[in-house]
Amino acid sequence: MDFDFRLGKPFVPPPITLKQIHDAVPKHLLRKDPWRSTYFCIRDVSFCGLFFYFGLSIERILRSEFGGYLPLTAAWQVKLGRALLWMAYWWWQGLSFASFFCLAHEFGHQTLYHNKYVNDILGYFFHAAILAPFFAWKASHNAHHRTVASIERDENYVPYERSYYQLPPKERATTADYLEVLDETPILTMGRLLIMQCVGWWLYMTTNAMGSRRYPKGTNHFSPYSSLFRPEERLGIVLSDIGLIGMGSILYYASKLYGGKAVLMYYFIPYVVRGVFFWARYVTIGLVLMLTYLHHSDPTIPHYRKEQWSWVRGAAATVDRPLLGWMGRFFLHNVSHDHVAHHFFSYAPFYNQPEITKCIRGVLKDHYNYDSTNSFYALYRSFTQCMFIEEEGAIVFYKNKHGQAAREVAEDQLKIIDERWKAEDGRLQCCHESVSGF
């Protein structure tokens, strides 16, 4: 169901079993192809090198006046040409860095090679190259897959409740009450959105911002004793920290050798979003925050409390989006185009997910969530409409700054589904996937 269709339809939880989902997907789509996986690794590294070579060639391109095809007769033309070439480099290299993140994400799910150590070693280096702690993120991300859309247990983008904003009870709250707390100028909204896109990743890594609030203050992804991790994961956390220190050292010595400006231009600007061009350059970290936020933050998608949550319901509470069109498929490895399939089959290689999506759409039917909205507008829409949820209710939707939810639960149909669900003990589906979800 597309966004507009969901808006006009009361919500009914999917009356679907895990067996129905699994039976719809041919087993060959779940198999790894090491040669094909190797191709994608080589391809992404090659594109990174190609874009880096392009960056090194910018001044030569200007001196040659674009190979003689575009004479530059004035100083302003040279400056404009230089600015456009650098922006092109930052955009494409940013996509390349984002492809490293998405490949490491697949390695974290053990989807590309049969050998666990091969997956972990390659994922470790791909993530370290873009200053991401592989084993730490792998641990919290796999926990997210086991508990997706659970208000009590999910790891990421857990909605704020009414009490967080100190709003009056809904029975006596007025529109003015909501606007006093939640309304803001467009400039302030864009400023907060820009902050989330630029530094949201590091806020999550260092302070657990936008993460589960069941963890104590000081929770982060760098301490092996963080509440996020089990004792057997601590060695991996230390190794992740060593990888970050190693990459940081490489960048430090590169700045000593080639200058800080060179490291900024060739590495850090593709790594983060920068000010005035943020609308056109959601690179690396901005892309990562954008795609992960939009997977699970939408006014028409539910969150569940424990009495109504099941693993199947949580996995279905995600959204497929055509983020960046062909560029998203090529560089981001289907992570947004086929995110629903990824949550149902996180152990399947990304290159088979388009086919898996086709298979499960026939089972999910109206419970398959898709949004054809331009992803940049969808980001703004979710950021401004997904404000808070109520403290009560087993199935809840985000409310906007007016205290209104985009959808309501079809209570009459929910009772019928609940009787069938409890009879089949649907909540046990969580247990089946807690193993395969890695």
Report residues per predicted region.
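Transit-peptide-like, low-complexity N-terminal presequences
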Residues: 1-29, 371-438
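Topogenic membrane-insertion module of multi-pass membrane proteins
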Residues: 1-92
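Intrinsically disordered, low-complexity domain-flanking/linker segments in eukaryotic proteins
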Residues: 59-80, 171, 326-327, 418, ...
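Post-HEXXH active-site segment of zinc metalloproteases
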Residues: 61, 113-129, 157-161, 354-359
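Membrane-embedded alpha-helical segments that form the functional core of polytopic membrane enzymes
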Residues: 66-67, 71-103, 121-135, 322, ...
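Acidic (Asp/Glu-rich) catalytic motifs at the cytosolic membrane interface
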Residues: 97-116, 137-151, 295-298, 336-347
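Hydrophobic transmembrane alpha-helical segments that form the core helix bundle
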Residues: 156-322, 422
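C-terminal, well-structured subdomains that either form a transmembrane helix-short loop-helix hairpin
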Residues: 329-363
